Amino acid sequence: MTRVLYPLVLALALIALRPAAATLEQPRRIVAVGDVHGAADAFAAILTRAGLIDAEKRWIGGRAILVQTGDMTDRGAGMREALDLLMGLENQASKAGGAVHAILGNHEVMNMVGELRDATPQIFETFGGEAAMRDAFGPKGHYGRWLRRKPMFAKIDGTVFMHAGIGPDYLKPSLDELNRNVRREIEAWDEGVRWLVREKRVTTQPEPRAAMDAARAEIERINALAEEGKATPDMGRTAQLLLPVANVGQSSLFAENGPMWFRGFSLWEEQPALQLIDQLLERHRVRRFVTGHTVQRGGTITERFPGKLFLIDTGMLGRPSFPNGRPSALVIEGETATPLYLH
């Protein structure tokens, strides 16, 4: 054994003595795109303008990084086409040495739990009906499986990308902790709904309100039995299983000030909030935040707290939902962040 180890140690020593490369790798080009909401043509157009795809919608961005900050879904009839494009580019970019990062938005989460209030008849038609769309975004569905692997935050080269923001109730956790928490909450929802379906308390892929009501009814039934001393340990475990469904409105998935819905980054007054923004940047060891969620007036990307926060939802879907909206992207190269528009 000793004679085998000596050559390895010698080889490691020789490697350690080699001089480091003299050239430093340049920062990778990052292109961030905000809320798409089914505007498939506009999404493809801004990616083309940014030099990421060709006329056939194939990746030509090389080592560039595309970040989409959530809300690909709902409202626009091209929702499925836009999702398919993003999913396809993820694989193509990886093979070319680049990357695609898809961030969860509140509308993706809504779709995953079966809340389809912002889906239109035209969207349902592209899936073959409302029931088929629910299946597609369920735990075993084509889009549901893909989305359940996606984060709420991505930290890339000194920038944190997210859909909405980080409110006062979420200042302490790390980004990894926040990402793990949202994944746990989605998994807990799925597990609770599976029980409700299996026990025939709800139909397959129920609407969220039906699942919440059924979960609460079952918990109340178990509590009543517990007061009479008739509840079994299995019933207690069932109640724990159903609590995340019954109380999903208080989870980070749907809380008004949670990371999926918070609008403070757009609404905070500049001077009072500057210290808080600086604290957040220091907490997460980054130089800037990039977020969507809140449509910016005039269809232009907004820079706040000079250079520290960029709001990139410019209402890409356009009329009638966002009359002044237009496609846009934020191009980040090292220290520089530059808005990009079609016109």
Language-model features, listed with the residues they occupy:
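Bacterial N-terminal signal peptides that target proteins for export
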Residues: M1-L8
